[in-house]
């Protein structure tokens, strides 16, 4: 499998942008039934800009995993779309705090680890950790459904709920705002050996 982290305009294949929006539409609109902005089979919103950073995973069938990274020094989803998930906390507005959104995987396209979590999830967060270390990011935040929160805990990611820590209504699901601690616990959680092979997409050579 090929792994990419960065801006879409830096990806070696220009087609990946529409592939990403189609993949997101299949996951968030078709499979989960979320109320998202979808047009002609593409799910895209105002946070998708040329400067948005991504982690992407693809195999011979196409994209099978993604996550979006947004700096909290700029407009981001938690205070704009899901303010109740802040649970009474003030929204971070710092360049060393980033938000994770649009996490999606096709779990059937990779092995599962001993804890039952798909390798794709672990690889995505391994790349997120590397990105955060390189950028001097000290903390990550996200809004997640309760099932996704449980997956993160099974993986061993060091997370805590924001504010009053109670689940809130996110529309189609109930969920929480969470904070990730970027410490040695995070590094251990994503440091498991993998059965699959994951190479850097930037090293992809086209004939």
From Swiss-Prot:
Its EC number is 2.3.1.184. It catalyses: a fatty acyl-[ACP] + S-adenosyl-L-methionine = an N-acyl-L-homoserine lactone + S-methyl-5'-thioadenosine + holo-[ACP] + H(+). One of its GO terms (biological process) is quorum sensing. Keywords: Autoinducer synthesis, Quorum sensing, S-adenosyl-L-methionine, Transferase. GO terms for molecular function: N-acyl homoserine lactone synthase activity. Required for the synthesis of N-butanoyl-L-homoserine lactone (BHL), an autoinducer molecule which binds to AsaR. Belongs to the autoinducer synthase family. This is Acyl-homoserine-lactone synthase.
